[in-house]
Amino acid sequence: MPQLLGGRLKDVLIVVLVILLIASWGYFFTRPKPPTYKRLTDPEVLVIAMDTSDAVSLDPARAYELTSCLVVNQLYDKLVDFAPPDYTEIVPEVAESWEVLPDGVTWVFHIRKGIKFADGTPLNATAVAFSIKRVIKLKQAASWVLTQFGLTEDSIKVIDEYTVQIKLGYKVAPRIFLSCLSFTVGAIVNPKEVLAHQKNGDLGSEWLTDHSAGSGPFILEKWERESEIVLVANEKYWKGTPRIKKVIIKHVPEPTDQLLLLEKGDIDIAWSLTSDQIEEVREKPGIKIASRPAFQKAYLGMNVGFKPFSDERVRDAIRWAIDYDAIIKMLKGGAKKLQTFIEEGILGYNPATPYYRDVNKAKALLAEAGYPNGFEVELMAPPSYPARDVAAIIKSSLEEIGIKVNIRLVTAAEMYEKYRKQGHQLILAEWGADYPDPDALAKPFADYRVKQLAWRNMWYDDYAANLTEQAAVEFDLSKRLALYKELTEYVLDKGPYAILYQVVNQIALRTWVENFEPDPTFFLLDLSRVYKESVYEVVP
């Protein structure tokens, strides 16, 4: 009996084992397959879509357009820079320290040791002196940023291997000169490479149009015009190799095309979407908006040479007539209220906004000035967004007080050519600071002697011009701020402008892009700080 039981038990165990084996085979062949993942983006490559058609040259001595300046800042270092995210504090870069001698015009810069250009050549005082002299000698459009201080080639001297002396032509508030050195013309180029590619005494300018010779975080790999600009990481960068190994700036002029590429994930950053498009994608999964007030403003210029505008009361009437709120609402986050010529974020910003839409007050001022029935005027504006829409609101506002406005939409090139010859009546334009200091705004808006905006609008006001000069040479910061407060209020009340709004930069990007912050200018953005997260999706 026990033997029989043992045999049956053995048979049962064999059957169970067979069943388990069959079940395991079945599971093996029918079990769910492990998911397959697809990487959505390369974390080492940053792709930006923007209109690059403005770029003329990537030579720091010639770069003066948005695209050119943005790229140059990735390729080169300067003596000083502005610290993000506020861009209000001037910090050392190539120069580790500096001092102004007692004469108030002689500056001594001590160069940081250990910095090398991308080809391994040491960056020293000779390179710094060569770069600044090169800007002065080439006399390109942006050179005025440095030559305005009376600099000549003889003004720059090498004291020793890591010390440079720069002697200005006159005393100036230290912050102004340092701010100007942060602009692209302050970039330090490699004399060895530049002179090796010199043609007919051009100091390598033709070669530098589409090559780089810097010590910055990136190196220019190629520039295919109307196609793309490609940068690769500088493995020898003295601050450390960027996490992004390649930056591709694609030429995509149409915002609609930028939007489609962003939504598909083919690009990381869409540089210039319209306000409507920004609103459209604001809540879309995988996309975020980076925004900050820019050092740029839109304004209405009134030519004092046009008889009605020679009367301050007429200019004031226009300021009271404009529907500022309607303009800002139309721009959907792309603008904020500003009525003085120094933008928020720049030293000397005056938050005063006394003007609002008051039709009755505007009509009364017109009548008092002798224009109870208004007059007819031409408003020049570019045909692009948002200028044409802002012009329409201004037209509607002014016609409500009896001023008939004929809008003339012309290309920016034609408009500015006429503007520079004082050939307008009303003009809708934008202006940004060439360097982040109030002097960069006070001179054009208040000093007609520099032949910029005040001169173009035929506003020859000696009080405003003298106040501008006084502020520029004031070393005491508190006194300088007081001068700019007085000047901004004076121009607000007496000047030939209606400041409409401060531009707010809004840039759409994929959520996998980290540490990207729009800078308030077009030349301080540092892409070496940006990185990308790896993002995957399950393949069906």
Residue spans for each PLM region:
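A bilobed periplasmic-binding-protein/Venus flytrap-type ligand-binding module shared by bacterial periplasmic
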Residues: A83, V232-E235, R292-A317, A321, ...
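Detector for C-terminal structural segments
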Residues: T67-L70, E224, A321-Y349, Y385-K395, ...
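Gly/Pro-rich hinge or "lid" segments in bacterial periplasmic/extracellular proteins
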Residues: A83-P85, S182-P242, K246, V359-N360, ...
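Aromatic- and charge-enriched surface segment that lines or borders ligand/interaction sites
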Residues: E96-A141, Q165, Q258-L261, P308-S310
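N-terminal lobe/hinge region of extracytoplasmic solute-binding protein
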Residues: A49-P102, K133, H211-S215
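Structural transition elements
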Residues: F218, N303, K336-E368, S384-D389
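Surface-exposed binding/hinge segments that line
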Residues: H110, W144-H197
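Ligand-site clamp/hinge motif
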Residues: E206, N234-E280, K404-N406
